[in-house]
């Protein structure tokens, strides 16, 4: 009888302990919160409590008996799918430029740099998903997030370099082509990639919020001060691109006006071409701004205590810019279209005329 009572008491203690653990997990923001947030860190208790910043380690959920499986966040799945599409598109562009001697010109070197940066960004999104759920650790988180920062910084820098190249090709049309060399373009890209790599190494070298959770940004483990620097750099790049595209539009309209004076009227073909060119520039800049501006603004005004869904909802569209870049800067180009046909069809003779286009053409 005493043994039965003791067994009953032990069972009650186990039940009470289990209920207390479940309540504690719920209070700490566990699976019962019902929100799409980031996976909670394994050592959350030592970090000072849960918050809404984008975490980089996975939360464990119950699987088969004796096995714990990571609970997959649907937002992370979307980012991984986006990264897969980005990597596939840009890998094709890099392969086309690398395998076609006619595409090894300064203009296509810039496009190749953009495609390489976007390819690395896509691979980084895939690796982030894999490591987050298979090898969750703070060291791996720092490496993957630094890799993504460097890749996206190189992508934005390459876009700026392409914009500068287009502006100079129009503003100094008579002398720019003779002065522009592959060596100069390579030196420019080497400088931009060095700066981008430095921005990506900062979290790994210690500029992170692992030691002080209150200093975290909306993307953990990036420190709020580091994210503020990245956002300020983006706003500066966006402002320069906006100014240059406005200047490009002014040059285009001035050339159209000169043609009109020579011909005493602006012929409909010239007017249509001018409007089309200005419209294309608006699409290019609008796509870039619509993709990155929401995330850059939220990085400045957001807090690590805000729901993580806000971070995901602004970060996902930012990745779409790397998905659209190959379409805008590569696949619309006739030389790349011809190289693609030759790659897919072997000795197929494309009917697309091989005409060298200037960097001012989108």
From Swiss-Prot:
Annotated GO MF terms: G protein-coupled receptor activity; sphingosine-1-phosphate receptor activity
Cytoplasmic compartment segments: 95-106, 165-185, 250-277, 332-362
Gene3D superfamilies named in the record: Rhodopsin 7-helix transmembrane proteins
Modified residues (Phosphoserine): 356, 358, 360
Cellular localization per UniProt: Cell membrane
Membrane topology: Multi-pass membrane protein
Glycan attachment residues as annotated in the record: 2, 9, 51
Record Pfam families: 7tm_1
Lipidation positions, renumbered (S-palmitoyl cysteine): 345
CC per GO annotation: cytoplasm; plasma membrane
Extracellular membrane side: 1-74, 131-142, 206-230, 305-309
The keyword Ubl conjugation is annotated on this UniProt entry: no
Principal location class: membrane
GO BP annotations, alphabetical order: adenylate cyclase-activating G protein-coupled receptor signaling pathway; G protein-coupled receptor signaling pathway; positive regulation of cytosolic calcium ion concentration; regulation of metabolic process
Record keywords, A-Z: Cell membrane, G-protein coupled receptor, Glycoprotein, Lipoprotein, Membrane, Palmitate, Phosphoprotein, Receptor, Transducer, Transmembrane, Transmembrane helix
Annotated transmembrane regions: 75-94, 107-130, 143-164, 186-205, 231-249, 278-304, 310-331
Keyword Phosphoprotein (UniProt): yes
Family stated for the protein in its record: Belongs to the G-protein coupled receptor 1 family.
Record's function text: Orphan receptor with constitutive G(s) signaling activity that activate cyclic AMP. Promotes neurite outgrowth and blocks myelin inhibition in neurons.
Name under which the protein is recorded: G-protein coupled receptor 6
């Amino acid at each position: 009888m005493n043994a039965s009572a003791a067994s009953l008491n032990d069972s009650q203690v186990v039940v009470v302990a289990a209920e207390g653990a479940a309540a504690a997990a719920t209070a700490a923001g566990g699976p019962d919160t019902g929100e799409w947030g980031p996976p909670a860190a394994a050592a959350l208790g030592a970090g000072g409590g849960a918050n809404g910043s984008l975490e980089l380690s996975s939360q464990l959920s119950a699987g088969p008996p004796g096995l714990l499986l990571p609970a997959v966040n649907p937002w992370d799945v979307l980012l991984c799918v986006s990264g897969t599409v980005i990597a596939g598109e840009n890998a094709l562009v890099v392969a086309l430029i690398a395998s076609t001697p006619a595409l090894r010109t300064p203009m296509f070197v810039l496009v190749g740099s953009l495609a390489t940066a976007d390819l690395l960004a896509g691979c980084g999104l895939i690796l982030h998903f894999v490591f987050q759920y298979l090898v969750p650790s703070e060291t791996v988180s720092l490496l993957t997030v630094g890799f993504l920062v460097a890749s996206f910084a190189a992508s934005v820098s390459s876009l700026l370099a392409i914009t500068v190249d287009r502006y100079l090709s129009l503003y100094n049309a008579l002398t720019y082509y003779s002065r522009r060399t592959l060596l100069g373009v390579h030196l420019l890209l080497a400088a931009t990639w060095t700066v981008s790599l430095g921005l990506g190494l900062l979290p790994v070298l210690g500029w992170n919020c692992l030691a002080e959770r209150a200093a975290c940004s909306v993307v953990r483990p990036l420190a709020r001060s580091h994210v503020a620097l990245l956002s300020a750099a983006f706003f500066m790049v966006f402002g320069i691109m906006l100014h240059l595209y406005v200047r490009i539009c002014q040059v285009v309209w001035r050339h159209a006006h000169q043609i009109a004076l020579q011909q005493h009227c602006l012929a409909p073909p010239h007017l249509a071409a001018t409007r089309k060119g200005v419209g294309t520039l608006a699409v290019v800049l609008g796509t870039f701004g619509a993709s990155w501006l929401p995330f850059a603004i939220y990085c400045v005004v957001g807090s690590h205590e805000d729901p993580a869904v806000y971070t995901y909802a602004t970060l996902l569209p930012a990745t779409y810019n790397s998905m659209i870049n190959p379409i805008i800067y590569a696949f619309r180009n006739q030389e790349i279209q011809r190289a693609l046909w030759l790659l897919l069809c072997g000795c197929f003779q494309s009917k697309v005329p091989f005409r060298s286009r200037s960097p001012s053409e989108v």
